[in-house]
Swiss-Prot record:
Recorded GO CC terms: host cell plasma membrane; membrane; viral envelope; virion membrane
Record's bilayer topology term: Single-pass type II membrane protein
Signal peptide boundaries: none
Site positions per UniProt: Binding to the glycan motifs of the host receptor: 180, 242, 264, 323, 369, 407, 422, 512, 540
Disulfide bonds: 178-202, 192-253, 244-257, 350-471, 382-392, 465-475, 545-556
Main location: virion
Lineage: Viruses, Riboviria, Orthornavirae, Negarnaviricota, Haploviricotina
Enzyme class: hydrolase
Subunit structure: Homotetramer; composed of disulfide-linked homodimers. Interacts with F protein trimer.
This enzyme's EC code(s): 3.2.1.18
A matching Pfam family: HN
Catalytic activity: Hydrolysis of alpha-(2->3)-, alpha-(2->6)-, alpha-(2->8)- glycosidic linkages of terminal sialic acid residues in oligosaccharides, glycoproteins, glycolipids, colominic acid and synthetic substrates
Function text: Attaches the virus to alpha-2,3-linked sialic acid-containing cell receptors and thereby initiating infection. Binding of HN protein to the receptor induces a conformational change that allows the F protein to trigger virion/cell membranes fusion. Binds to the glycan motifs sialyl Lewis (SLe) and GM2 ganglioside (GM2-glycan).
Listed name of the protein: Hemagglutinin-neuraminidase
Length: 582
């Protein structure tokens, strides 16, 4: 064994230390070792941290995935439930809005037909109140107050020759007699009609009586309809009823009139409105008449006048058109003081500064002819279930939506409400609005008006308000010429031009002459059919159309005031024609 390099032995037996490692070298070695150990520990720690982080991430990802999967499952379950609920709701909506109304209408028609069948026979053995039931022929029931055309397509029209039928409107019987102001309403079960019989020529502020009739549509042997009169009432009680409007109601007719023996201009100059009358006539010969004072009348109106055109029975309410003069310092007068509506014909606009035109439009509501009263349109609304106590209110539209108040008519077609307003002020074209009411159990009801832009023809007018004038100015002119819409109006762009309506116009810009049957679109007349000789004097016209659902024939009755050279100044004539649509 090699001797130790650390120690050596000498001869004198003493020990001496051998070579020794340097202390500095040992310190460096320890430092390197520590650095190495720390590095290994650091790397190990980092690896542990990274590994733990990755494990945590994987665990979290798995949990999130599970959560997302759970949420997705719940969403799919909810979507399935919603789809099922939507399907049920669609079935309910279709049932309520389509199937049920059709079923009810079918049952109603069947019931009416059954009643018409059983209510026949001799009066002694009949179980009905009268020999003939107040029910239109079944062929017409489902074609009344319906839009004839609903496809918005382009159509052509032809108006047939007047059909020869007995007139349901009696004429005057003396040279100085006068029958004027016809009002006609056709309901699903029956029709109602009225006109004024003036005793001294056509001065309606003197003395007059009121003729009222009700009847049904029947089919003649020739195949076309006839207006069969079943009941007549002649109100000759000394009251000078004026401007009466009629409406068909369950089992009878309702009529709204006002009573006055002074000039219309004097009514506007006063401060207290004339007497308002509501008359109910039923098929069992019951006649009930009440003086009414609708909410909003006293203190607001100098005068209130029925609209002449027919009213409607709608949602258990009786609605009539009206208009009149508003007192300037009344709450209604103050509220509407700055309101005005100025329509514009884009094909024939009025030139001038807009501010000036607006001021002129505002002034047009205050004609000096009517003592500078604001002339305002309104609606008389009466709750039918309280009709015997005449619980009525006046619902006043905003003048920001309507022109100056005038005569008018309320139409109910396919459950849509429309309002015709006579063009009495400066606007020369037909005025037709879609309207919607908001009725309240307490407080003031309201109405919204949406103007239908018609520019196809003008009414005759005098002075600055002839049929050629399109600029705002104050005047009282024009003539009552109500239209009958054949199609619903749509606000959808591009199809409004296919809105069609028919009526009888007076083909002159200044004179009430040349009665002419027509069919019109918004911007152009489709067909014209003059009635009588050129220059024939005429006045008010009112039109109603219906369909024979048995053979799909369309009929229109144009009721016109025509000049008479034999008996009286006017003869009211119902002209029945067949309307062909292709």
């Amino acid at each position: 064994m090699e001797p130790s390099k650390l120690f050596t032995m000498s001869d004198n037996a003493t020990f001496a230390p051998g070579p020794v490692i340097n202390a500095a070298d040992k310190k460096t070695f320890r430092t390197c070792f520590r650095i190495l150990v720390l590095s290994v520990q650091a790397v190990t720690l980092i690896l542990v941290i990274v590994t733990l982080g990755e494990l945590v991430r994987m665990i979290n990802d798995q949990g999130l995935s599970n959560q997302l999967s759970s949420i997705a499952d719940k969403i799919r379950e909810s979507a399935t439930m919603i789809a099922s609920a939507v399907g049920v709701m669609n079935q309910v909506i279709h049932g309520v809005t389509v199937s049920l109304p059709l079923q009810i209408e079918g049952n109603q028609n069947q019931l009416l037909s059954t009643l018409a069948t059983i209510c026949t026979g001799k009066k002694q053995v009949s179980n009905c109140s009268t020999n003939i039931p107040l029910v239109n022929d079944l062929r017409f029931i489902n074609g009344i107050n319906k839009f004839i055309i609903e496809d918005y397509a382009t159509h052509d029209f032809s108006i047939g020759h007047p059909l020869n039928m007995p007139s349901f409107i009696p004429t005057a019987t003396s040279p100085n007699g006068c029958t004027r102001i016809p009002s006609f309403s056709l309901g699903k079960t029956h029709w109602c009609y009225t006109h004024n019989v003036i005793n001294a020529n056509c001065k309606d502020h003197t003395s007059s009586n009121q003729y009222i009739s009700m009847g049904i549509l029947v089919q003649t042997a020739s195949g076309y309809p006839m207006f069969k009169t079943l009941k007549i009432q002649y109100l000759s009680d000394g009251l000078n009823r004026k401007s009466c409007s009629i409406a068909t109601v369950p089992d009878g007719c309702a009529m709204y009139c006002y009573v006055s023996t002074q000039l219309e201009t004097d009514d506007y100059a006063g401060s207290s409105p004339p007497t308002q009358k509501l008359t109910l006539l039923f098929y069992n010969d019951t006649v009930t008449e009440r003086t009414i004072s609708p909410t909003g009348l006293e203190g607001n109106w100098a005068t209130l006048v029925p609209g002449v055109g027919s009213g409607i029975y709608f949602e258990n309410k009786l609605i009539f058109p009206a208009y009149g003069g508003v007192l300037p310092n009344s709450s209604l007068g103050v509220k509407s003081a700055r309101e005005f509506f100025r329509p514009v014909n884009p094909y024939n606009p009025c030139s001038g500064p807009q501010q000036d035109l607006d001021q002129r439009a505002l002034r047009s509501y205050f004609p000096s002819y009517f003592s500078n009263r604001r002339v305002q349109s309104a609606f008389l609304v009466c709750a039918w279930n309280q009709i015997l106590v005449t619980n009525c209110e006046l619902v006043v539209p905003s003048n920001n939506q309507t022109l100056m108040g005038a005569e008018g008519r309320v139409l109910l077609i396919n459950n849509r409400l429309l309002y015709y307003q006579r063009s009495t002020s400066w606007w020369p074209y037909e005025l037709l609005y879609e309207i919607s009411f908001t009725f309240t159990n307490s407080g003031q009801s309201s109405v919204n008006m949406s103007w239908i832009p018609i520019y196809s023809f003008t009414r005759p007018g005098s002075g600055n308000c002839s049929g050629e004038n399109v600029c705002p100015t104050a005047c009282v002119s024009g003539v009552y010429l109500d239209p009958w819409p054949l199609t619903p109006y749509s606000h959808q762009s591009g199809i409004n031009r296919n809105f069609y309506f028919t009526g009888a116009l007076l083909n002159s810009s200044t004179t009430r002459v040349n009665p002419t049957l027509y069919v019109s679109a918004l911007n152009n007349l489709k067909v014209l059919a003059p009635y009588g000789n050129q220059g024939l004097f005429a006045s008010y016209t009112t039109t109603t159309c219906f369909q024979d659902t048995g053979d799909a024939s369309v009929y229109c009755v144009y009721i016109m005031e025509l000049a008479s050279n034999i008996v009286g100044e006017f003869q009211i004539l119902p002209v029945l024609t067949r309307l062909t649509i292709t």
